[in-house]
Amino acid sequence: MYLYNSATHKKEEFIPNDPSLVKMYTCGPTVYHYAHIGNLRSYIMEDVLEKYLRYVGYPVKRVMNITDVGHLTSDADEGDDKMLKGAKREHKTVMEIAKFYTDAFFEDCRKLNIKRPDIVQPATGCIDEYIKIITKLIDTGYAYFSNGNVYFDTSKLDKYYIFNEHKEEDLAVGVREGVEEDTNKRNKNDFVLWFTKSKFEDQALKWDSPWGTGYPGWHIECTGISLKYLGENLDIHCGGIDNAFPHHTNEIAQSESYIGHPWCKYWMHVMHLNTASGKMSKSKGEFLTVSLLEEKGYDPLCYRLFCLQSHYRRNLVFTWENLDNAAGTYQKLIAKVAALKNDGGEIDNEAVATLRERFNAALGNDLNTSLAVTALYDVLKYKTNDATKLFLLDDFDKVLSLDLIKKADEVRKRAAAAAKPTAGVYSILAEEGSEDAEVTAKIQARYEAKKAKNFAEADRIRDELKAQGIEITDIPGGARWKRI
C-alpha cells in the first residue's frame, strides 16, 4: 500500500514500525458545537483508511482525543476557550456541553458508518501526562515560563515547519480578526503548553500544577494522549488539513523534543469541504450538519458516497445539486444490487481474484476511493454469477461501508410487500406474467426519490424505464407497470 505522507510531500510505501499492530491516532472534535459535514469528511476518509488496513490484514489500534478544554477561538494561543464560550452560549456547564456534543458527534458517526476508535480519551482525563511532559520540556530547555503561562520555545528547534516549504514570514499562525496576540511569547511561533489563571479569570476547568492553578494548551493534549496509549513510535497521524499548521506542527515539535527521536512515520491530511462562499466553518456560522441533511430527506450514507467519489487530497465542493447526484447514484446502485438473485450459487474464485485486484489497486494507491467505488460497478458488470457478485459487494463494503447488501435487502422486502396491496403501503403491480425484480427495484427507487423530493432523480428513473419499454402508471397507494 502507498500513502501520501504530508511530512515528506510524497507517496510512500506503507511500512509500519511493527506489522503486528498499526498504531493510528486521530485528532478528535472540540465538543463545543455540532460537527459540520466538512469536519465529518475527514473522519469518513480516516475511517476508510483504518478499515482498509484491517481489510489487507493489519491489526489496528486507533486512538482519538476529545478536546473538552484548552482549544482557543484562534488556532494559535489567542482568544477565548471554545468550550467556555459554548457553555456561556447555552447557559450550561462546560462538562454538560462536552457530554452533549460528544454524544452528538458519535451519533453522526454512527449514521455515517464511521467506526468508533478503539480508545476515545477526553483531554481532561490526562492532566498528569501533560504535566509530566511539560516538566521535562522545561528541564531540557525547550520550554519557559512567562507571565503565568508555560510556552514551548520554537527557537530551540533546527526545523519547525514540517508540512510546507514556506518561509516563516509567509505563514499565519491563525490569529483571527478581533483576537489579540499573546505578547508573552519570546518568538512569534512559540505556543502555550500550560495556561494559568492569568489568562482567564473565569476559566471553568482548572488543575493544580508546578506553575500554578491552570489548564493545558490545545497542542499538548494530543501529544499526551498519543504517548499514553500508543507509545513513542506512532505509525499514522490523521486530521483535516486545517490541523497541519499550527496544531500538528506543534505536536511534532513538543513530542520529538520530549522523546528525543522521530515520533510519527506517516501523516495523512484530508482537504477542505467548500461551499460557494468558501470553506465550511463554525466560526463563521456557516455549516451544515448530518441532522439537517436528514431533515431534507437525505440518507446520511448518500453524503458518505459523495465524499468517497472524490480523492481525499482534493478540495470537495458541496452543493445541493452535487448531493442530489450522489443520492441518485446511491439509489441506482442499491437497485442494481437488489436485482441480483441470492440463489446460493458457487463462488467464482477466478472472478474474485480479478475484481479484488482492481479494488486493491485503487485503495492501495493513496486511498483512491473514487476508483474503489468504480470497482463496485466492475463487479456488477462482470460476467459471473450473482452469488459471486453479492460476495464481492459485501466484501468491498467492509471498507466502503455503504450498507449495500442491507439496503438492497430492504428494497427487496419492500418490493415483495408492494406486490400485495395493503392500506398505507406503497404497492407495485405488474401486468400478468411480467414480474421482474429489477424493474420493481427501480420503481421502488423512484418512489424513494419522490418521497425525498428528489424529483429530478424520479423523472430520470421513469425515463430510463420508458427507454427499456416499461410504462409506469401512478395509482392510489402505488404504481402499476407494463411492457409496451
Predicted regions and their residues:
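Structural preference for alpha-helix termini/caps and helix-kink/transition segments
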Residues: K279-S281, F287-I484
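Short, glycine/charge-rich beta-strand/loop segments that flank catalytic centers
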Residues: V63-G70, A98-F105, K115-Y130, G148-L157
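Alpha-helical recognition segments enriched in aromatics with Gly/Pro capping
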Residues: M1-Y32, D47, E107, I127-K341
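Short, well-structured beta-strand/strand-turn elements
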Residues: P59-K61, G141-N147, K383, E471-T473
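Anion (oxyanion) recognition and catalysis
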Residues: R54, I138, K466
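N-terminal, positively charged nucleic-acid-binding surface of large information/translation enzymes
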Residues: T8-K11, N17-N113, G477-W481
